Amino acid sequence: MKSLVKAKKEPGIWMQDIPVPEYGVNDVLIKIKRTAICGTDIHIYSWDEWAQATIPVPMTVGHEFYGEIVEVGKEVQGLKVGQRVSGEGHITCGFCRNCRAGKRHLCRNTLGVGVNRPGCFAEYLALPATNVIALPDNITEEQAAILDPFGNAAHCALAFDVVGEDVLITGAGPIGIMAAAIVRHIGARHVVITDVNDHRLELARKMGVSRAVNVKYQKLSDVANELGMLEGFDVGLEMSGNPMALNDMMKAMNHGGHVALLGIPPQETPIDWNQVIFKGLVIKGIYGREMFETWYKMIAMLQSGLNISPVITHNFPVDEYQHAFQIMASGQSGKVILNW
């Protein structure tokens, strides 16, 4: 089958013909229809320090997908051939303390699809049935292909009560933009998103934010004053991994505010702990998606009218994957889809 493989320990990804994966009695085999490129895939392509330390070579990459079930393991119940599906890309152990307590997103033994085990940038994917998400008919193929990052956004955006609150989002990448759409959909008052990329800030405006702010040219304090905010932001969602953005967020928070951290810093990050302590801030780290409460909620939000389609800016046939990766890496895009 056709597959995109990290075949060499150097920058690049290669299209190769490899065998269709075998599937076990508790697995399903999925015919891949659409996939989306993630920032993780860009790290793997560029072969940066994280990728070199993490990715076994060779490895079929990719973890964001939509497809249809073509084979079902003999012990699988509740799924059938022909169903439209996406899936949770974190494979958990089932026996650690958190798994046994129903908190699988905190499994210490997690394996990532397309990172630690073969991924979805291929014509077929074998996946444990417990990780497969059957989709209702009113979820489009493109939406289904980006449910994984939409789930990151939902997990973060739903970490704290945002109804009637003023929300600051630092980082206008696709996940930050989708988080902005979510908090607006569920009832936040002012939603402010910051970045230094004008293309992505314009995309955020299309998703309904109150203000999209280029912090190279405008201060957060001025924006808050213009919006009539007298006491700072109630909820902060840090999506950028940028140390300066994190500390700017701490300064902009109201006393008693809540901060969710999803962005991954490139190195150890100094924090002004006086802002945290004297303001009584609550900080929560966010990783992946709650299994499977986040999935239920994000599908329900799409069914209730939340539109995330504007974040999808490019579609390419898989044979043009090199150009697709270049577009994604340029920062001049939202989500980029590969059609199989």
Swiss-Prot record:
- What subcellular locations does the record give? Cytoplasm
What keywords tag this UniProt record?
Cytoplasm, Metal-binding, NAD, Oxidoreductase, Zinc
This protein's pathway? Amino-acid degradation; L-threonine degradation via oxydo-reductase pathway; glycine from L-threonine: step 1/2
Query: Where along this sequence does the record place binding of Zn(2+) 2?
Result: C93, C96, C99, C107
Q: How does it assemble?
A: Homotetramer.
Q: Which family does it belong to?
A: Belongs to the zinc-containing alcohol dehydrogenase family.
Q: What is this protein called?
A: L-threonine 3-dehydrogenase
